Amino acid sequence: MLDAAVDIFSEKGMGITIQALADRVSVTQPLVHRYFRTRADLIAGIREKIQFAHWDPAWREVLTDRSHPLCERIPDFYARYLPHIYSARWYRSFWYAALSDPTFAQEFLARVHEELLLSIIGEARFAFGYPALECRPAGPREIELVWGMHSTTVFLGIRRYVYHTPVSPDLQTTVLDQMRAYLHTVPEVMEELMPSARKRTVIER
């Protein structure tokens, strides 16, 4: 029933009603009320489903597994992450939820930042021989650089499913191109930010 509610929300946003859900799943409105006593409860359930039900702790494990070079880990992460969000249902639902309540997007993006993007920065620091984040927190330039890679990749879905404009069908190559640009630029940025902090030279990125 909650999946059907998310489908409706992706189409109508905050225009969703208990009756619309009952009609979609071909049950009576009183039956829906057994699961969602109020419309606010329904919206809360949809929000939880969109925001965190798909979250996989293994994503961070992939990014921090140093038995593989970083240039393999980043594409592997996106190969696992994007299938969970790359659909009209998820993008449009997320968009509607964020417009109705900015804290929705803020909470989700905070988790992306803390668990995923800071992991990439930390692993890039290690790969290029710079201090760990525990010793020196990430600065604005490092943060915006990794957000640039992530945002460009994720924005493909917004262009396709929200704006309905053409995008490359080869998502894997787009991810690789963004990663290469990031790994090419990040050591230069780190050297500018921490010119005397580099400890070693690492060949495999």
Q: What annotation goes with each model-predicted range?
A:
Residues 4, 8-49:
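Helix-turn-helix
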Residues 46-77:
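Amphipathic alpha-helical linker/stalk segments
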Residues 78-81, 94-98, 149, 153, ...:
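Short alpha-helical scaffolding segments that buttress acidic/His motifs in well-ordered protein cores
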Residues 80, 84-87, 118-126, 151-159, ...:
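Amphipathic alpha-helical interaction surfaces
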Residues 85-110, 158-162:
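Amphipathic alpha-helical segments used for helix-helix packing
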Residues 93, 103-132, 144-147, 176-180:
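Amphipathic alpha-helical packing segments from all-alpha helical-bundle domains
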Residues 129-180, 189-201:
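Hydrophobic/aromatic-rich alpha-helical bundle segments in the mid-to-C-terminal region
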